[in-house]
Amino acid sequence: MTEATQASPADSGHPPRPGGRIGPLLPARLRPLDRPRLWMELACTGLLYWAYTLTRNAVPAHRTAALHRAHAIWHTEQVLHVDIELTVNHAADRVGWLIVGMNYYYATLHFVVTIGVLIWLYVRHPGRYRAVRTALYTATLLALAGFAFLATAPPRFLAGRGFIDTVVVHHTWGSWASGDVASLSNQYAAMPSVHIIWSAWSGLTLAFLARRTWVRVLGACYPLATFTVILATANHFVTDAAAGAATLALGFLIQRLLTGRPAYPALRRNALTASQP
């Protein structure tokens, strides 16, 4: 992710135009446009990761409630005819190399890609970094609250429903919540899907800020691929994915209220910039 991008007004440090603004709730001194110092950003990211790990790996006390919530989600999806998880799970499991690849995709890419996009954003778009990063961190914190107060089991935990735990069946290390390490991880942190939050954030960031068309296309395809993977591996319901998308949207809304500026440039302005030589 090293392509050059022509700076927008925000990237060059100039304040956005005042028309149609929402907020800001924060005073000007708490919403600078320049990127933060690297050591401070690493510390904040480390604290967020520590909170994520602590909450994500805390074994919930209400296992029965988590399973009941999962059964309720599955029943509701059946009523609404959006229960595609079982079909996708079984179809992917029939192709050995595909499902093994999906297991490793599920285990690794949400960390690797998100960190990569954060680094690219910090280096190439310093004027956008704070706003876009704030939306991601806010959405992640909201997801952690969901894990703590709305523990939900993944589809593969629903006995008698026919879901395949693809990590166990294919003997991969595709998830901390399967196999031999399951006792070390919170297996009821399905709602909302952090995979969807992070992949949608990464995809939007690339789609809005990357200059090269193929990078923008990859950004648009990445959350769709992640959505397929989380269903194929029976780690999330469609509802979990929808909740993840809604959580990210709320993260962007909170960021806008706090700073009074959008995280991304307007589509029209971005298109004009991309068309310039």
Residues of each region from the PLM?
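Alpha-helical transmembrane segments of integral membrane proteins
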Residues: 36, 40, 44, 130-135, ...
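Aromatic-anchored segments of alpha-helical transmembrane domains
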Residues: 50-54, 140-148, 221-232
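N-terminal transmembrane-helix/juxtamembrane module of multi-pass inner/ER membrane proteins
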Residues: 2-112
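Alpha-helical membrane-inserting segments
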Residues: 51-59, 81, 85, 146, ...
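Hydrophobic alpha-helical transmembrane segments
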Residues: 104-121, 195-203
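Membrane-interface loops
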Residues: 56, 63-72, 84, 122-214, ...
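Interfacial helix-loop-helix junctions of multi-pass membrane proteins
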Residues: 154-161, 186-191, 225-251
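C-terminal membrane module of polytopic membrane proteins
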Residues: 233, 237-277
